[in-house]
Amino acid sequence: MAEESSLEVQSQTAQTQARLRFSTRDEDLALPESTGPILVPTGLRRYALSTLVNNLLATEKPVPLEFLINGTYLRTSVDEFLTANGISAETTLDVEYVRALIPPLHVASFLHDDWVSSVDVLSDSQNEERIISASYDGLLRVWNMSSEIIHTSASAKDGGHQSAIKCVRFLSASQIVSSGIDRTVRLWKYTDQEKGITPQIEYYGHKGSVDSIAVHGNRILSASADHTVGFWSTKKSESPAVPQNLLPSSSARSSKRRKLNSSASTSQRGPLALLKGHTAPVSAAIFDAKDSTVGYSTSWDHSLRTWDLVTAALVDTRTTSHSLLCAQHLPEHTLLAAGSAARHVTLIDPRASATTVSAMTLRGHTNAVVCLARDPDSTYGLISGSHDGTSRIWDIRSTKTDTDGVVSESIYTIARKSAGEGKRVGGDGVKVFDVCWDKKVGIVSVGEDKVIQINRGEGVVPKTA
C-alpha cells in the first residue's frame, strides 16, 4: 500500500522529494505497522499531507490533521521547513500527525462598569457552571452562563473590600477567597441561594497590596507588594489572632461604621507565617501541584523562590534576567512557567539540582506577561495573558533551538473582542489581567476593557499519549 501511495504521489510532480515516516499517538488513526517511509514532493503543505494520510487510512470521512516535525507544527511547505531548519532532503523525516485543532472561538462577553482584575470558574457535574469576577470597583460578582449576575459581594460600607480587588479564587463549591489593594485576604461563604456571598474571615498581616493568591484544601498563599508571601489557614481554630499593629487604624468614624454593618460579626485572623526573602514586590505565590507542603513565588526582583511551607523556610532561589510577574506549575515536566516583564514566558526548572535556570522560552507577546493557566485537557498546553491585549496558547512540544536556546512560538492568539479589527498599540485599553482555562466553560479572560471574554475550542492542544 505504501508503494502504491509513493508511486501516486511521485506521478503528481517531478519536483524535489523527501521521505516521510508517519506516526501518531492516536490509536484510532494509526497506520498499519507495515507502512514504511513515503516519498512525497517537498512542495506539499499541511492540507495535502492530511489528504495523503487520510487516503492511506481509507477513512470514510476525512479527518483534518496537523503535522509535527521535530516537535514543531508544520506551517509551511515541507521544502520551506527543510530549508529553515538546515535539513537535507535526503534525510528520512519522522512526522507525527494529530487531529487538527479547533481554534478557540469567541462565544460570549460579560460587561462590567470597571476594570476586571481577576476571574475564576466553578464547574462540576452537579450544578450549572459559575464564573466569579473581581473588579477595581471593590466588588465580587458571580455570573451564570447566561451572562446574568446572580450574586454580588458586600460593598466597602457593608463589610467588603475597602478598595480595588486584585485576585479571586474558588476555594470550593462553598467558599471563595479574595485579596486586594486594601492589604487584606478575605474568605467568603458562597451559596447559590439567596444570601450568595457572605464574609467569613478577614486576614491581616500584609503591609502592602495583596496582588495574587492561590488556594489548596484549607490553605491559602498570598503574594504582596510588601515583598512577602503570606501563608494562611481557612480554619479559625488554626489561625492566630491578629497583632494589634496589623489591624487597620480605627478612627471613631470607622469604628462606628463597623458596628453598624455586617463586618462586626466577621472574624479577623493573622497569618500562619509571612515568608520573607524577596527584595521587591512579590507577583505570584502558588502551591506545588503534587506536594502542597511546597510553595513557589515569583517577584519583581527577578527571582523564583521555593518554600517549605511546613517550616516556613526558604529552600532555593532561581534568579533570572527579568522581573517575573506570574507563575504556573507544570509538574509532569518538572517545570514552572513564569511570565515576565520582558514580554516572554520562561520555563524554569525549580529543582536545586538543575544546572540551568531557563529550560525554554515562549516568545510572541509584545508587552508584559501577567497571567498563566494550564490546559485542562493536555499536559503540554498553556495559555498566557498579556498587557499587549492578547492571550496566547502554547504547545510546549512545538520548539526549536536558536541563539537564545530552546524557544517556542504560540499556536493560537486570542485578541480582545472589544478591540474589534483594530490593533491597539501596546494593548492600550485592552490589557489582559487574568485568564482561566476550564474544561467545560473554556478560556475565560478579563482585563482593562471591563469585559469577561469567553473563548471555546475543542482539543485546542493535542493530548499526551
Swiss-Prot record:
Subcellular location(s) per record: Nucleus, Nucleolus; Nucleus, Nucleoplasm
Major localisation: nucleus
Presence of the UniProt keyword Nucleus in the record: yes
GO cellular component terms given for this protein: nucleoplasm; PeBoW complex; preribosome, large subunit precursor
Top-level taxonomic group: Eukaryota
Keyword rRNA processing attached: yes
SMART domains given in the database record: WD40 (SM00320)
Transmembrane residue ranges: none
Family matches, as InterPro entries: G-protein_beta_WD-40_rep (IPR020472), NLE (IPR012972), WD40/YVTN_repeat-like_dom_sf (IPR015943), WD40_repeat_CS (IPR019775), WD40_repeat_dom_sf (IPR036322), WD40_rpt (IPR001680), WDR12/Ytm1 (IPR028599)
Residue numbers spanned by region Ubiquitin-like (UBL) domain: 18-99
GO terms (BP aspect): maturation of 5.8S rRNA from tricistronic rRNA transcript (SSU-rRNA, 5.8S rRNA, LSU-rRNA); maturation of LSU-rRNA from tricistronic rRNA transcript (SSU-rRNA, 5.8S rRNA, LSU-rRNA)
GO molecular function terms noted in the UniProt entry: ribonucleoprotein complex binding
SUPFAM superfamilies registered for this protein in UniProt: WD40 repeat-like (SSF50978)
Subunit structure and binding partners: Component of the NOP7 complex, composed of ERB1, NOP7 and YTM1. The complex is held together by ERB1, which interacts with NOP7 via its N-terminal domain and with YTM1 via a high-affinity interaction between the seven-bladed beta-propeller domains of the 2 proteins. The NOP7 complex associates with the 66S pre-ribosome. Interacts (via UBL domain) with MDN1 (via VWFA/MIDAS domain).
UniProt family annotation: Belongs to the WD repeat WDR12/YTM1 family.
Record protein name field: Ribosome biogenesis protein YTM1
Species this protein is from: Coccidioides immitis (strain RS) (Valley fever fungus)
